[in-house]
């Protein structure tokens, strides 16, 4: 497995901008200092004598849309964002750009296009034509046009697990691969892969611990309660499946969640994990870590351990272990804290 490397912006060439129709000039520049993720500034200027109406969803912003032409080494790069069905535009869907007025917006391109592979990239903004419906408007609608192209070298996220997803034709045959959705940036992809490596480490450690019965093991007692052979075997099975999911299954991580919690999954939809705000601020390892979050979420899948959320936090998890060990075996946080093992216990 190759280590994920940051993007190196070694070249930011700006080519000549084509003349834009309807008096609209589109200028694209790279954002300085974006060393891990590719961000661009788009400046639109109405060079005509009349106002121009721009469809808001044709401007880079919070909503996904295939607004850029991205190529790597001369070959088109896949758009990975959402494709949205919309109603016909109404007045509220337009933004007015007066004569002589400019508008600058920023876009994070590597979150919407597959820029994980190393190579020479070019990026160009495209403003498609949308037919005007209804009566003629006082302001002209912007017609099809494009910006200049910016070019840059990208080191990419070089990881065998990411590349594996493109090498397999049959979905059921995919193994040990990682894919991304929800506008994951290259920084986020690298962070996820680092967390996944750490999750693999603590899952392996947990499986090794459970491979030999330890009736007096304090680590087990803290998180799964008093020793019982049947429950011990169940814990061993659960972690064997968690380890297998990390090592051998096609994992998908979605970065689109804006909620304050750590992550969530749909138990009957393996192996997709939705990562939220608290995940990104958590440490890689330790209590309530990124690695532990991955273990927690994978345990929820019905094909893994089918755990529930019966109590959150170490205090509640310890209480479950001491008062109802069977429920502790069904609680995702108990699996997470057993795997994280902080503070360390034997």
Swiss-Prot record:
Cofactor: Zn(2+)
Top-level taxon of origin: Bacteria
Annotated active site: 297
Provenance organism: Aeromonas hydrophila
Ligand binding (Zn(2+)): 296, 300, 309
InterPro entries, A to Z: Fungal_M35_metalloproteases (IPR050414), Lys_MEP (IPR029463), M35_peptidyl-Lys (IPR034115), MetalloPept_cat_dom_sf (IPR024079)
Protein name per UniProt: Extracellular protease
Function noted in UniProt: Heat-labile protease.
Keyword Protein transport belongs to the record: no
UniProt record similarity statement: Belongs to the peptidase M35 family.
Gene Ontology BP annotations: proteolysis
Cofactor comment: Binds 1 zinc ion per subunit.
CDD domains linked to this entry: M35_peptidyl-Lys
Lineage: Bacteria, Pseudomonadati, Pseudomonadota, Gammaproteobacteria, Aeromonadales
EC number, as in UniProt: 3.4.24.-
GO MF annotations in UniProt: metal ion binding; metalloendopeptidase activity
